[in-house]
Amino acid sequence: MSGISPLTKGKQRGIQVMMGIRLAILAISFLAASTPAGHAESPAVRNCTWCHGTGAQGYTPAPRLAGQRSQYLESQLAGFRSHARDNPFSKQYMWGAAASLSAQSAHELAIYFSALPSRPAGDGDTELVATGRTIYQQGMPEDNIVACVVCHGPNAEGVGQIPRLGGLAYSYLQRTLEQWGQGYHLNSGAPMPDIASKLSPDQIAALASYLSFIK
């Protein structure tokens, strides 16, 4: 039989993505300072879609940006530039990509992406949704873990610099909770490292599943 195997196609796709990332970093470096960022046709927006997908709906391992809170997006871009957001994916991809963004460009990008329509990933385990909902809404008093709803809102919509979690991809939510528990972002001053470190893998899976379905 002839043709390209799925494995080879996957490797080729990976190479294409990495090349795109490198080109994006170069383009941002040369263009971000002189081009309005908050526009659908701006180089900065187009570069973001290399990893975050068309319409910024997310593309593994990059999260959905569409509909995310602008204050959160802006603070995270600042965290990438200062290296405060220090997990492996941030170091590999976003430290370089955000390095040359001005504060104004970061603000414009955050406003632009926050205004885009979003759709829930809906890719979690439906059998875990009920358990995840209970953890989100009630917390785990026996482990001194406050309910997620207290900070992230009844529909996981977030507030201010607290992110919207509703509808994000299962894999992103799971990985982020695991990284919080592993001690990343300790210098952010956020309570999540302590909270996530008390969650078991099964509890993380349940939470991520529940959140992935929220519209």
Labelled PLM ranges:
Residues 2, 18-22:
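Positively charged n-region of N-terminal signal peptides that target proteins for export
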Residues 22-33:
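Bacterial N-terminal signal peptides
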Residues 31-45, 55-61, 115-141, 163:
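Electrostatic cytochrome c docking/interface patches
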Residues 45-83:
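The feature marks the first
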Residues 47-54, 109, 145-155, 207:
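The canonical Cys-X-X-Cys-His
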Residues 59-64, 80-124, 159-164, 182-215:
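Axial heme c-ligation environment in periplasmic c-type cytochrome domains
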Residues 64-71, 151, 164-171:
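Short cysteine/histidine-rich metal-coordination sites, predominantly Zn2+-binding motifs
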